Curated annotation (Swiss-Prot):
Species of the source: Aliivibrio salmonicida (strain LFI1238)
Gene name linked to the record: ribA
Pathway(s) per entry: Cofactor biosynthesis; riboflavin biosynthesis; 5-amino-6-(D-ribitylamino)uracil from GTP: step 1/4
A single GO BP: riboflavin biosynthetic process
InterPro entries per the UniProt record, alphabetical: GTP_cyclohydro_II (IPR032677), RibA (IPR000926), RibA-like_sf (IPR036144)
Protein name as it appears in the record: GTP cyclohydrolase-2
Record's catalysed reaction(s): GTP + 4 H2O = 2,5-diamino-6-hydroxy-4-(5-phosphoribosylamino)-pyrimidine + formate + 2 phosphate + 3 H(+)
Length: 199
């Protein structure tokens, strides 16, 4: 059974000025060190909180890589939840589940003309190896079963519902287009992501 292990206060965001709490967990199936970042005590004060399931992206989240939009999506979610409350489930699923080194191998292939999915497939991986069962377990540990999910990804929508979480609403993030990620974003759209690249 999954339960909260520790709950600590910290300030987050680009200027470390947004109050939040970080939660660790016991009893997750794979024992990966996923965490939840809770804003405005949303797990205690809201019946249907905003939730983003954000998969770790070292290159984008930490180093602000031009190749993806992960860091911008994370920052958008933090800023949104600072106002309205919410929960970010930060999941250790680098590279859509293939790991950091394999993702860097995929980047090499992308530099030679493959898109993000073709590169993963060429390395012997599926389009997306992530599983969101542990995200549902984390929500269960917080006694949350209905959420407003912040995502553009149809797989996340399907998977979290398959694990028993009810979606009250799907909230899309903006399209964060910048030099270097245009092909990546177009590939996501081609795979069903709800992104308006014309804005």
């Amino acid at each position: 059974m999954t339960k909260v292990r520790a709950r600590i206060e910290l300030s987050v965001g680009q200027h470390s000025n947004i109050p939040a709490e970080m939660l660790s967990f016991e009893g997750l199936e794979t024992e990966k060190e996923h965490v939840a970042i809770v804003f405005n005590q949303a797990d205690k004060t809201q019946k249907t909180p905003l939730v983003r399931m954000h998969s770790e992206c070292l290159t984008g989240d930490v180093f602000h890589s031009s190749r993806c939009d992960c860091g911008e999506q994370l920052e958008e979610s933090i800023n949104k939840m600072a106002i309205s409350g919410g929960i970010i489930l930060y999941l250790r699923q680098e590279g859509r589940g293939i790991g950091l080194y394999n993702k860097l191998d995929a980047y090499e292939l992308q530099s030679k003309g493959m898109n993000t999915y073709e590169a993963n497939n060429h390395l012997g991986f599926g389009d997306d190896l992530r599983d969101f069962k542990e995200a549902a377990q984390m929500l269960g540990a917080l006694n949350i079963n209905t959420i407003k999910l912040v995502t553009n990804n149809p797989k996340k929508i399907k998977d979290i519902q398959d694990y028993g979480i009810t979606l009250d609403e799907v909230v899309h993030t903006h399209a964060h287009v910048k030099k270097g990620n245009e092909n990546y974003l177009q590939s996501k759209v081609d795979h069903g992501h709800q992104l308006d690249l014309d804005k």
